[in-house]
A protein has these predicted regions:
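Nucleic-acid enzyme cleavage-core boundary/entry regions
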Residues: 2, 22-28
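A general alpha-helix detector
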Residues: 315-316, 327
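Divalent cation-coordinating acidic motifs and surrounding scaffolds
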Residues: 27-226, 232-235, 303-313, 319-321, ...
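Alpha-helical, heptad-rich or low-complexity scaffold/stalk segments
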Residues: 53, 326-327, 331
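Bacterial N-terminal signal peptides that target proteins for export
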Residues: 1-12
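Eukaryote-biased recognition of electropositive, low-complexity segments
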Residues: 177-181, 187-189, 200-303
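Bacterial N-terminal signal peptides
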Residues: 10-23
Length: 391
């Protein structure tokens, strides 16, 4: 009798999951507008966007990691065109790498919490290495919900993008992506899935259901597309402007010199990938999403994180320490004006570069999409449903 009850219970659970999957798949194609979006003040200056990226770092995913490194700044640049201006925070989780985690933790690593410090995220991304391992999609989704300090703002756009190429049902007895996806939706977090390979194979591996359960979009990419560097006539101009932009940063406090060195390190990392990545990074650095208030005095004063008069002389760079107190604020104001002028020049050159890239990609893509393209498409669709508009 007990055996019969267990069989009936298992059958009921299987049928329920089939029904739930069918219902969610049917709903996946349409992103419904958020009812709160109509209440958004169009004059609101900023609104939060929390973006968590979960990357498979198992042995076959080198192309995915390279795509993420090459295209992070393109994704930032797309969001910089949203209105109201996003207050962007990015978090990074990796899964499937046994040398950097353990079985008890599902082979997952929290690389960064949600942060506005995009250079820190990029530095972590550049340090990633792949090796063989098990890829537990449901577990990665679970940790994305639990590990990150998500915004409590009801008007925040909260997104997860999870990318990989193995069955999404691995270790489902521990964390089933169907239940985790439903919880994410109930918490206002949208889960998008990206399969690295053929779209139909991704469907067989249940990656479309990951997005369906999480209320997001399913995409399949050719990992090689994301690493192609398209050079433009504007790239060298942007690199020259980037050097001038760097000269306007004023490190302060205990984090100042480390922050400045990290910024320069990430310039060098982008340069190693290619001139196109460096140009995209220069555009991102000139946007309002690139905020270094924690270590740069110009950003800190502009965003009211710090006041020059409250800082001790030892907290200031040598160039400012030599100035009388009344001249220090004038020094920061001069740097602010110089930066604003350079940012304007970068924006103008970047607009021409973007048109060149659109034309080049239309001719060369062959219908295949890269990582940044599918992420940007989903981001824009879901941001518009939340009340954002794009230039």
């Amino acid at each position: 009798m007990c055996l019969r009850n267990r069989i009936l219970a298992s059958l009921f659970t299987f049928l329920f999951l089939c029904f739930l999957s069918a219902q969610l798949t049917a709903q996946a194609g349409a992103i419904k507008p958020d009812p709160l979006a109509s209440e958004i003040d169009p004059h609101c200056r900023t609104r939060p966007i929390d973006l968590v990226i979960c990357l498979d770092t198992s042995g076959s995913m080198e192309g995915l990691i390279d795509s993420a490194r090459a295209r992070l700044w393109d994704i930032v640049n797309s969001l910089a065109k949203a209105r109201p201006l996003p207050q962007l925070r990015v978090g990074l989780i990796t899964y499937g790498s046994p040398s950097r985690s353990n079985a008890a933790n599902g082979w997952l690593v929290k690389q960064t919490d949600l942060t506005t410090d995009l250079d820190t995220v990029y530095a972590k991304m550049m340090s990633l290495r792949t090796d063989g391992g098990d890829e537990f999609v449901g577990w990665a989704m679970r940790r994305a919900l639990d590990w990150m300090q998500w915004s409590n703002d009801p008007q925040a756009l909260k997104l997860v993008f999870i990318a990989g190429n193995e069955s999404a049902d691995q270790a489902s007895e521990v964390f089933n992506f169907r239940y985790v996806g439903e919880e994410a939706r109930n918490r206002g977090i949208t889960v998008n899935s990206i399969y690295c390979g053929d779209r139909e194979v991704g469907v067989r591996e249940r990656w479309d259901q990951v997005a369906a359960c999480g209320g997001g979009s399913y995409s399949a990419i050719d990992m090689r597309c994301g690493t192609i560097q398209i050079e433009t006539p504007q790239d060298k101009v942007l690199l020259e402007l980037n050097l001038k932009l760097n000269a306007t940063y004023v490190p302060y406090g205990s984090l100042g010199e480390a922050g400045r060195e990290r910024q320069l390190d990430q310039d060098r990392n982008a340069d190693r990938i290619g001139i196109a990545s460096s140009a995209s990074r220069a555009e991102a650095k000139a946007s309002k999403l690139y905020d270094n208030s924690g270590w740069d005095l110009v950003d800190g004063v502009k965003n009211k994180r710090v006041a020059v008069k409250d800082l001790k002389g030892s907290d200031l760079p040598a160039a400012m320490q030599a100035l009388p107190a009344e001249k220090r604020e004038e020094f920061v104001e001069t740097q602010f004006r110089a930066r604003a002028d350079i940012q304007k020049q970068i924006a103008e050159v970047s607009a021409s570069r973007e048109q060149f890239l659109r034309d080049a990609r239309a001719q060369s893509s062959g219908g295949k999409q890269a990582l940044d393209e599918v992420m940007i498409d989903a981001l824009r669709t879901q941001a518009k449903a939340k009340g954002f508009k794009f230039d």
